[in-house]
Amino acid sequence: YMRQLLKKYKQRDRERQEQLTSDPLHPVQLPISDEVYILQKYRWLILSNQSNIRYHSDLRMDQHFHVLMNTYDYEDWLFRIDSNLKDFRDLKEQYVLFNSRNGGNPIAARTEIDELIVAYKKSSYEMFRDFANLLEKYKDPIINSFIMVKKVGNGKIYDSRLSNGP
């Protein structure tokens, strides 16, 4: 979705540049648009897990906008470009939290995955409805992945989630 959004704004910018260029030998060079700049440089604010993002409230000069901005400002810009991005991020975070809350507790994971499937199926976004179908199809292997086992590595014994792979 992010790539499609970026392509849409790049195409818009190319068309705008072509409209302004009257002489093909001297094309008009437009600066990068605000939307393309934000989507290229700060899409990680949507794609990263929120728990991994260090939000800075201290202001720093942004070279593109020529104003003082912080992480919250960039996030706000992303949401203004496309309000769906906030919903996507929030729905993604539900799955991230499901994973982090249920490590070592497959019984709780079984209950919570059903709630997650219902929430995703009710979503107005096709990608999350499709993901709900995947969760439903692979529910048992997903639940089994929350079983913790003792493993040995680097001379130490530690707990690790059971792998469904080879």
Model regions and ranges:
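Short, conserved catalytic/metal-binding micro-motifs enriched in Asp/Glu and His
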Residues: 154-166
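Catalytic center-proximal scaffold of phosphoryl-transfer enzymes
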Residues: 1-150, 163
